[in-house]
Amino acid sequence: MYQTTAALRSAFLEFFRSNGHQVVDSSSLVPGNDPTLLFTNAGMNQFKDVFLGMDKRSYTRATTAQRCVRAGGKHNDLDNVGYTARHHTFFEMLGNFSFGDYFKEDAIRFGWTFLTEVLKLPKERLCVTVYQTDDEAFEIWNKKIGVAAENIIRIGDNKGAPYASDNFWQMGDTGPCGPCTEIFYDHGDHIWGGRPGSPEEDGDRFIEIWNIVFMQYNRQASGEMLPLPKPSVDTGMGIERIAAIMQGVHSNYEIDIFRALIAKAAEIIGVTDLSNKSLRVIADHIRSCAFLVADGVMPSNEGRGYVLRRIIRRAVRHGNKLGATEAFFYKLVPTLIEVMGDAAKGLADTQVIVEKALKAEEEQFARTLERGLGILDSALNELQGDTLDGETVFKLYDTYGFPVDLTADVCRERNIIVDEAGFEAAMAEQRSRAQAAGNFGADYNAALKIDAETAFCGYSELTGNAKVTALYLNGESVPAINAGDDAVVVLDVTPFYAESGGQVGDKGVLVAQGIEFAVSDTQKFGQASGHKGTLTAGSLSVGQVLEAKVDKKLRHRTQLNHSVTHLLHAALRQVLGTHVTQKGSLVDPERLRFDFSHFEAVKPAELKQVEELVNTQIRRNHELKVAEMAIDEAKEKGAMALFGEKYDAQVRVVTMGDFSIELCGGTHVGRTGDIGLFKITSEGGIAAGVRRIEAVTGAAAMAYVAQQQAQLEEAAALLKGDTQSVVAKLKAQLDKMKQLEKDMQQLKDKLAAAASADLACDAVVVNGVNVLIKKLDGVEAGALRGLQDELKQKLKSAVILLGVAQEGKVNLIAGVSNDLVGKVKAGELVAMVAAQVGGKGGGRPDMAQAGGSQPENLDAALSQVLPWITERLA
């Protein structure tokens, strides 16, 4: 009964549903309401605001089977995964919660009843822990539940500070906290380990299966513990641990879910030893990677995306270690969906996208994996001592895409540690170089610290009077500036938009009688807006009143491009999938640039579909509606928020019909029809997993279309036709070119045949074998293959090496007749010569080609060929 993981999950949720709990779906692995969390790592994450009293639900009891990831950040199990019985990057946390409803006695009774009556675990196999001073919990266990006192273990402050204990939970330095009680299962005396609190507690005999937290205090900054008005309960039980117990196995990797994934991975790769730890790593990692992609995380070089990339690459490396020769990881997704059952619904809905994303990342890493592993292996073989230097670790990271933990994983297998401090130093040095390379001018934003606020009135007004509150010249605060000075002007209120969210700062003028300040840019300095520019007339002092005038034409063109990025974002998500998220943007009066997460190049047909979708929304002339609301309300309405952006409690929401809704502080058109026309000008990759679209709108789009039309007409004229016949005429020209190339090759072959007759006379005989070594002049590299074939036919039993030096390059070809490949291999011969002319190459035993970059060394290299061949023909 309840042998499978799926059955356990259902039994748990049904038990608590029947006891008045609301069954709540697992939340996303990407926390929606907690910027402090990288990933959802506990069942209580989605209820954090409820526990803090900031959110109220229609229920006071809840139960969940929450998907969790612990990799990266504070909670990071990645290094141990595969090497222990219970560490995972992904796990499911079964939990029940009380929000000011029941408390200690009911929480304890629910847990004990489920374990002993529903799952029928032997009571004698269970023991419990309580916080040292939690007499109430001790009494409940002992008097109400009937657990013998010797099986109730008090745990004190065992982590070096008051309330720092395995049995005292706290959300942070202040806020809700309280004691907890934990239930442990005894796997038997055949396994090493001691009871909780004993010196041997880290063994695997006694395993914690359920943690019940009693949130009863509100910790003050002073350390004082004040009682909460409504104590609550937060519990958690890892489904993998309880499944291992129910299935009679000791390791989590032996339960049904992992058995199926390990077997499938072994089948795909061709491995027979199912106990191999690398199979454990792969089976664990496919769970976290697949569900992260399903929840919208894409591999990238920052934040959550980089953690995902690290996990994928670790799995790929372990596959390589097992002998995988092609992409295998993504092929585990169907098996994962099958074994996860109801918990995989979201994954099943996004299966195609998940498989494509994993395959793309795996194939990309495969291009550098072998070479990187070769360099690492060489470094480890030459290592003196037990520490790999930080420079090598950095080179593997920077050049071959090896995350530090992947390098550490390889080193661990050889009892080598990595110099993480040296790696960090190399990283810091690279950042300094990059920063220095980017500092082409003064960085006002970094240099100026302005303790002032500027009110923004530019959503509705483009002109207005304002008082000068500060002036900065050469980074220093000054009371006045004079004509010709390049400065930063700070106003108390401004219609100028300061660069933010990808939208460039406004340009315009600040004027008064006899004074004109030309604003070339507007930037944020904390809460102040700084107007950068030049005082072109008069003198200006702090306290003066000016009229601020934004350049209306530039602002209007910028607004067109900003509004269309919202439409573009929504269109990309419709066409490519909801995994698409904005990674960056640039919106100026001339064009727009939009960076987004996607695992492959956008196909021409997809780009066309995106463009048509955006233009359809433009033609529908939606009114842009702007509203301010609480951020939680905005997210409930489906507003897109950007990861990494910091939002206030009140946010600005921009809606375009039923097509797009985003959080945005930028300026926009009144209706989508104002945009006029949208035209994509380019699409390409800028980083692994990140694509970029560049586009134009309005008059710029019309000009772009006109330019394209003009080029089409010019091409038609060159082809002596009209625009309708360009494609047909180009095809005809290409066919003609192919025929000419074919005719030319035939001529080259005839010339090669004629030349071979003369060259054959230059062959020398070595031990009865014709050997021809020749440097050729005036012969195209493309003709070498045909020439070599002709010579082999003429010379019969022969070894041939031909070289051509032209335009600073060397081309080599080696040919060996079939009767001689047992003694002389063309690939080895050509590789030997190529190494001496700055190149490399290879091929079959009977024919091989190579190139080089040092033609000046060709004669010397060829002089060594005859002795090399003679030695092998002896």
UniProtKB/Swiss-Prot annotation:
Cofactor entry: Zn(2+)
CDD domains reported for this sequence: AlaRS_core
Location(s), subcellular: Cytoplasm
One Pfam family matching this protein: tRNA_SAD
InterPro entries referenced in this protein's UniProt entry, alphabetically: aa-tRNA-synth_II/BPL/LPL, Ala-tRNA-lgiase_IIc, Ala-tRNA-ligase_IIc_anticod-bd, Ala-tRNA-synth_IIc_core, Ala-tRNA-synth_IIc_N, Ala-tRNA_ligase, Ala_tRNA_ligase_euk/bac, DHHA1_dom
Primary location group: cytoplasm
One GO term of the biological process aspect: negative regulation of DNA-templated transcription
Signal peptide: none
Keywords noted in UniProt: Aminoacyl-tRNA synthetase, ATP-binding, Cytoplasm, Ligase, Metal-binding, Nucleotide-binding, Protein biosynthesis, RNA-binding, tRNA-binding, Zinc
Record note on cofactor: Binds 1 zinc ion per subunit.
Binding sites annotated in the UniProt record for Zn(2+): 562, 566, 664, 668
Cited SMART domains: tRNA_SAD
Domain notes from UniProt: Consists of three domains; the N-terminal catalytic domain, the editing domain and the C-terminal C-Ala domain. The editing domain removes incorrectly charged amino acids, while the C-Ala domain, along with tRNA(Ala), serves as a bridge to cooperatively bring together the editing and aminoacylation centers thus stimulating deacylation of misacylated tRNAs.
Recorded family membership: Belongs to the class-II aminoacyl-tRNA synthetase family.
Function: Catalyzes the attachment of alanine to tRNA(Ala) in a two-step reaction: alanine is first activated by ATP to form Ala-AMP and then transferred to the acceptor end of tRNA(Ala). Also edits incorrectly charged Ser-tRNA(Ala) and Gly-tRNA(Ala) via its editing domain.
Identification of the protein by name: Alanine--tRNA ligase
Organism: Shewanella sp. (strain MR-4)
